């Protein structure tokens, strides 16, 4: 029996793989509309360090779910799921194809798998956990999470304060692991026929070279001034998800006089390479993904062939 669900394309890949360029080309070939799946591009005023599409690119191919939050605000995977589904329904209702593009794997997982029913935040408990984070350090709390919820600990970086504290909060409120609660939720059939593409260079050294080239281009384009403007606001701090974004955290520390320029660059590159490694690890475990070499001159033709084949 043929699948009658509307088509949606999911274009994933590590940072600096070239997803934006391919997505714009596919939008024109498929008659689609782009939806950003990037937890950094949601923030207004954070353009250079997030490699946000340029004004010219956005005029040619608008991206939904870009510039939807102030850097002082938070945005959960559950909120992303609600927003993305609404955008996908709107695009499909116009007879066009939703093209989701980005590398925030937690957003993608929550979009497809759904969001577990979790207890509401407990202000008193969160305050206590924040105090422990300050006194004991995030690494110590991550070790604790590894003992009580190894599944969640595997997916949460030790320095991702927001997600780390939330996982511990859920465990202390329910006595159950996040992974257990996720596994219990009923998985509904996703309303779209989803074609999943992973874009990445075949060689790691090629990706690392691109990461370095892009980081240096950001510095030349005024990344330092962009972060300085964020600091000058006075209401932002390094505990916020926006300021913890790769590159922003390292530049923030540099502007506070904690590191010199060379150290900032070295740490920024290291953090970006670590992010790319985590993204690739996650993608290798993704069921049914089609891998495309980002260096292939016919990458968009390969994707179109995969899409056409998925409908038969």
UniProtKB/Swiss-Prot annotation:
Cofactor(s) essential for the protein: Mg(2+)
Function: Catalyzes the transfer of a dimethylallyl group onto the adenine at position 37 in tRNAs that read codons beginning with uridine, leading to the formation of N6-(dimethylallyl)adenosine (i(6)A).
Region (Interaction with substrate tRNA): 38-41, 162-166, 244-249
Positions that bind ATP: 13-20
Annotated site (Interaction with substrate tRNA): 104, 126
Residues involved in substrate binding: 15-20
Gene field: miaA
Keyword DNA-binding: no
GO aspect biological process, one term: tRNA modification
E.C. code: 2.5.1.75
A Pfam family the protein falls into: IPPT
Keywords, alphabetical: ATP-binding, Magnesium, Nucleotide-binding, Transferase, tRNA processing
Protein name per Swiss-Prot or TrEMBL: tRNA dimethylallyltransferase
Subunit record text: Monomer.
GO molecular function list: ATP binding; tRNA dimethylallyltransferase activity
Statement: the UniProt record of this protein carries the keyword Magnesium: yes
Alphabetized Gene3D superfamilies for the sequence: 1.10.20.140, P-loop containing nucleotide triphosphate hydrolases
Record's catalysed reaction(s): adenosine(37) in tRNA + dimethylallyl diphosphate = N(6)-dimethylallyladenosine(37) in tRNA + diphosphate
NCBIfam families in the record: miaA (TIGR00174)
Family: Belongs to the IPP transferase family.
């Amino acid at each position: 029996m043929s699948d009658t669900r509307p088509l949606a394309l999911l274009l994933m890949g590590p940072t600096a793989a070239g997803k934006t360029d391919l997505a714009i080309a596919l939008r024109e070939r498929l008659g689609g509309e782009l939806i950003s799946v990037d937890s950094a591009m949601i923030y207004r005023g954070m353009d250079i360090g997030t490699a946000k599409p340029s004004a010219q690119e956005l005029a040619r191919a608008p991206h939904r779910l870009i510039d939807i939050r102030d850097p002082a605000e938070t945005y959960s995977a559950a909120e992303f799921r609600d927003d993305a589904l609404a955008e996908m329904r709107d695009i499909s209702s116009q007879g066009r194809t939703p093209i989701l593009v980005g590398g925030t794997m937690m957003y993608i997982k929550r979009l497809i798998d759904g969001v577990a029913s979790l207890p509401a935040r407990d202000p008193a408990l969160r305050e206590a956990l924040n105090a422990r984070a300050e006194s004991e350090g995030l690494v110590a709390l991550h070790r604790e999470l590894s003992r009580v919820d190894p599944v969640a600990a595997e997916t949460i970086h030790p320095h991702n304060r927001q997600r780390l504290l939330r996982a511990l909060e859920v465990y202390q409120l329910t006595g159950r692991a996040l992974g257990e609660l996720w596994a219990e939720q009923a998985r509904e059939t996703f309303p779209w026929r989803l074609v999943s593409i992973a874009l990445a260079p075949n060689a790691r050294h090629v990706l690392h070279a691109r990461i370095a080239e892009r980081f240096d281009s950001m510095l030349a384009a005024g990344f330092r001034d962009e972060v300085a403007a964020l600091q000058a606001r006075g209401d932002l701090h390094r505990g916020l998800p926006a300021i913890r974004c790769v590159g922003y955290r390292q530049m923030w520390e540099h502007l506070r006089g904690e590191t010199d320029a060379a150290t900032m660059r070295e740490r920024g590159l290291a953090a970006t390479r670590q992010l790319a490694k985590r993204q690739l690890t996650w993608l290798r475990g993704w069921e049914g993904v089609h891998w495309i070499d980002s260096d292939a001159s016919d990458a968009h033709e390969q994707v179109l062939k995969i899409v056409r084949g998925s409908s038969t």
